[in-house]
Amino acid sequence: SHCGPLLFLLFINDINQVVRNSNILLFADDLKIYKDIRSYEDCVLLQEDIEKVGVWCETNLMEVNTKKCFIISFSRNTTAVDYQYSLFHHKVSRVSKIKDLGVMMDQKLTFTEHVQLVSCKSYKILGFINRHLKEFPIDTFKLAYISLVRSILEYNCTVWSPFYQINIKTLEGVQNKFLRICSSKLGIGHQGYQYNYQELRKVLKLDSLELRRTKNDLLFLHHLISGEIDCSSLLEKFKLRCPSRSTRNHPVFKVDFHKTNYGFFSPIARLSRLANTYNDEVELFGTSRNRFKSQLKTSKLL
């Protein structure tokens, strides 16, 4: 029914009231309970909240599939607090990686496995459309690539955008494979296995995937600032820079210092640096979505 999803959300809307010691993330019927664990006492508090959620489910006559419940600890430390959590007297399985809303996350949040997963899937789909669209025009083949392959490579990329060259090249390799196929279809010559991918992208009017991720990051930030993405808790993490005197440079956001690559390339820091870098090329504040997209297309730096 049309009202079913809405009624379900209203029905479970009070589940956050039973969780007192932890935080929750709720998307439809997908619930995540999380807490910063620093000691054994924190584990006990998290277990109490898990049990309270179990009681809430029993009270509201909702069944929980314990086989689909998992525990994962996100930490870059070599040793983490180990605790056996349970639900309805059943041990909750502990995993080292988990797929959440289409993104594969490992314990250290490197997203390397996600890159490998989406690239492998994309290669298979690219091979499929190449076999079945051999006789179709190049425009049709390009449209199929954009719709079925590139969309997989860019899904939620603002969250997991890679910064190690090995992962960047892994993703770019999928599009390069597409470009090689197009080169053959168009009769564009090449020397052995050496292809001029930059020229092929110009012919097909495509950007590199790395450049597209940069544009998607800026577009995401624009949507967040303009209110198209309604998330005040995320917006407040960006710190506006208010200098006490006039300076030559005009950075928009203040970027905190990070000692590690993980912190330096984290989404908030990365998006803040991008906004500062392209501040003179694009206008994040007071522009419509279409106007901002036009600025991205005409930017000399992008």
Question: What spans do the regions from the language model cover?
Answer:
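Charged boundary/loop elements
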Residues: 59, 67, 155-168, 259-302
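Basic, alpha-helical interaction scaffolds
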Residues: 20, 90-159
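Active-site palm subdomain of RNA-directed nucleic acid polymerases
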Residues: 5-34, 136
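Mobile genetic element proteins and their domesticated derivatives, centered on retroelements
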Residues: 4, 12-15, 29-31, 57, ...
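Short, conserved micro-motifs composed of acidic
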Residues: 48, 63-98
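Short, conserved non-catalytic motifs in the polymerase core
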Residues: 1-7, 34-39, 94, 108, ...
